[in-house]
């Protein structure tokens, strides 16, 4: 009897991106970051300039990560979540924002741009 084995995609090992895949992802993230920053208003740009921030596409959704240097900046960034989410929603409807307070000063806050209507009602 001749047995043949058929593998499902789930049975295969994890996908290892090639160096070209990694480079293309980095270029995409750089372009998305530049587009986002250039379309922010001056107040948001000023806030971002004192933070470490970047765009990542490693998960199923594009994520804007903002690491705040202090609690005051963290609070100001949180107050600008709605306009930043609106801008990201124009780029990708599955995007999210993660705001990270300084180390050991709280947990990151994460918002999906598809939740925008909830936050708009609260900020009105």
Question: What residue ranges belong to the model's regions?
Answer:
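Structural motif
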Residues: 69-70, 102
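Residues at beta-strand starts and edge strands
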Residues: 60-62, 93
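N-terminal presequence-like segments and adjacent domain-start helices
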Residues: 1-44, 50-58, 89, 102-110, ...
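Short, non-transmembrane amphipathic alpha-helical segments
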Residues: 72-96
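Short, aliphatic-rich beta-strand segments
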Residues: 62-68
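Helix-rich interaction surfaces within compact, conserved domain-sized segments
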Residues: 96, 107-124
